[in-house]
Amino acid sequence: MGILFTRIWRLFNHQEHKVIIVGLDNAGKTTILYQFSMNEVVHTSPTIGSNVEEIVVNNTRFLMWDIGGQESLRSSWNTYYTNTEFVIVVVDSTDRERISVTREELYKMLAHEDLRKAGLLIFANKQDVKECMTVAEISQFLKLTSIKDHQWHIQACCALTGEGLCQGLEWMMSRLKIR
């Protein structure tokens, strides 16, 4: 009886899962958001504040907040943390000069109380560009293996083509099934 109830509950459970998409300016956050929501590339300009879209994957609803990444906006990221289940960090794989800034922002975020249970998905974006950092390099620069308090996954992607994005969503879906 309990198993039947659980299966029926899953059919009708329309719980929304809050996701924030962060990263430095020009990393590709907004492009990824609109690839998820419209499955196409849209012309974007720097995000001032945030964009929000609901994405439905296999009857699972994600409310995705794309938050501006300019230096002047990063201090306000924490206002979006409440009830966040997943953090997507978008890394510009061509931006070797600012990978250390990305690392600083990442660890600042992970230390925040409101994100202590959040899963972490890192999109290594712009993998289509020659001479970009590999997933292994980014993982090493960000010291991802030192993250013990959060489930995390790093995924190579290209926001312009959508390559790798579905695999990231699949990882998030797999984390929800475990809960």
From Swiss-Prot:
Keywords: GTP-binding, Lipoprotein, Myristate, Nucleotide-binding. InterPro entries: P-loop_NTPase, Small_GTP-bd, Small_GTPase_ARF, Small_GTPase_ARF/SAR. It holds the Pfam family Arf. One of its GO terms (biological process) is vesicle-mediated transport. SUPFAM superfamilies: P-loop containing nucleoside triphosphate hydrolases. Belongs to the small GTPase superfamily. Arf family. GTP binds at residues 23-30, 66-70, 125-128, 159. Lacks ADP-ribosylation enhancing activity. GO terms for cellular component: cytoplasm; trans-Golgi network. It comes from the Eukaryota. The gene is Arl5a. A lipid is attached at G2 (N-myristoyl glycine). Low amounts were found in most tissues examined with highest levels in brain, intestine and thymus. It comes from Rattus norvegicus (Rat). CDD domains: Arl5_Arl8. The lineage of its organism: Eukaryota, Metazoa, Chordata, Craniata, Vertebrata. This is ADP-ribosylation factor-like protein 5A. GO terms for molecular function: GTP binding; GTPase activity. PROSITE patterns: ARF.
